[in-house]
Amino acid sequence: MAKLTKRMKAIKAGVDSTKQYEINEAITVLKQFTSTKFVESVDVAVNLGIDARKSDQNVRGATVLPHGTGRSVRVAVFTQGANVDAAKAAGADLVGMEDLAEQIKKGEMNFDVVIASPDAMRVVGQLGQILGPRGLMPNPKVGTVTPNVAEAVKNAKSGQIRYRNDKNGIIHTTIGKANFSAEQLKENLQALLAALTKAKPATAKGIFIRKVSVSTTQGAGVAVDQSSL
């Protein structure tokens, strides 16, 4: 078993794993142990009351965080016609069709999000084995296959996050950076939870959002008292 670093020992000693922290207190605890070497992301894990083995209970979607994620996002767009100029005007970093597909086939993957207009999916569909495993395949459920590519680009650039539960029914995503204010992180978390509540499957019974924990990239999870949200 790997030895705990001094920092991890301090974090574990400073976080009560049996306690649910009020949100502002939870953020204070996170910031107290954040790294001084780089600005860590603030991540969240949300345990949902779903049966992830049932396809009709899986939760997937996207939402724009009011204060963004704190990271720069490069966007590639597959489209043609008038949408080309619209995508570029909205801030897309790469725009194309077959030419863009060829770049990707050569291993040129200098982007974080892929957006496609419906008429471009015949080209994008050929890239499934490349984009799929990386979580980059455009999907209408998260708004990345859309006739309005300009809006999708703006959303991606302004702090849109995508979420999808894992096999244990847990959503893992980012809600900002450790240098965000407590209020910014709280409002981003509230936006995510509101989106998840809206996406609750009709077949899911009982308490839907069962547990919320926040952590920094290299820190321990801090359970949040949902009543403080």
UniProtKB/Swiss-Prot annotation:
One of its GO terms (cellular component) is cytosolic large ribosomal subunit. One of its GO terms (molecular function) is tRNA binding. Keywords: Repressor, Ribonucleoprotein, Ribosomal protein, RNA-binding, rRNA-binding, Translation regulation, tRNA-binding. CDD domains: Ribosomal_L1 (cd00403). Belongs to the universal ribosomal protein uL1 family. PANTHER family: 54S RIBOSOMAL PROTEIN L1, MITOCHONDRIAL, LARGE RIBOSOMAL SUBUNIT PROTEIN UL1M. Part of the 50S ribosomal subunit. This is Large ribosomal subunit protein uL1. It comes from Histophilus somni (strain 129Pt). The lineage of its organism: Bacteria, Pseudomonadati, Pseudomonadota, Gammaproteobacteria, Pasteurellales.
